[in-house]
């Protein structure tokens, strides 16, 4: 694994509050967790976007394969592969994600939960087509988001955040450690 082979993806509204190994046994990690707040709508939307190729139909299977993380490594090659399989171009995929961002903030999208998780779509794709090349880790990856941050009033100095990101001295420490 090299750093240039992967995108490091983190949600924009996340405050780093815990360390996660993004690599295990020389393979990128796909995180999965179950959460009562998770909605089947993610799956329905992904199923529509991929013509049913990445669909999960039973609740039991959904719980066992519920991929989501606030930060994760996306392999560039697999991202290109996935976009090429389900979309005509990168531009079409970007338009799709922009429209998704717009729709998710509308009242009817909130009501019907018609939006997509890039983490779930990517993870379902990798699990289906590259399962032997990843490590699947069942863990609670949730970080403190902007709403929890304001409630908890936990703050990090710029220096502390910089140290968390850059620390490569200690095994397993540092958010960007490969």
Per-segment meaning from a language model:
Residues 93-178:
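A glycosyltransferase accessory/donor-loop signature
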């Amino acid at each position: 694994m090299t750093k240039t082979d992967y995108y490091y993806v983190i949600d924009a509204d996340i405050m780093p509050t815990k360390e996660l190994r993004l690599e295990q046994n020389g393979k990128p990690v796909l995180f999965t967790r179950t959460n009562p707040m998770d909605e089947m709508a993610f799956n329905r939307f992904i199923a529509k976007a991929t013509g049913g190729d990445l669909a999960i139909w039973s609740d039991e299977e959904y719980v066992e394969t519920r991929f989501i993380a606030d930060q994760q490594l996306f392999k560039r090659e697999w991202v290109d592969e996935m976009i090429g399989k389900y979309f005509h171009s990168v531009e079409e995929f970007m338009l799709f994600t922009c429209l998704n961002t717009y729709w998710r903030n509308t009242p009817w999208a909130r009501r019907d939960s018609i939006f997509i998780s890039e983490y779930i779509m990517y993870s379902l794709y990798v699990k289906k087509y590259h399962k032997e090349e990843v490590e699947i880790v069942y863990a609670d990856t949730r970080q403190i988001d902007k709403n929890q941050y304001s409630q908890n009033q936990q703050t990090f100095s710029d220096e502390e955040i910089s140290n968390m990101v850059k620390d490569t001295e200690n095994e397993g420490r540092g958010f960007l450690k490969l």
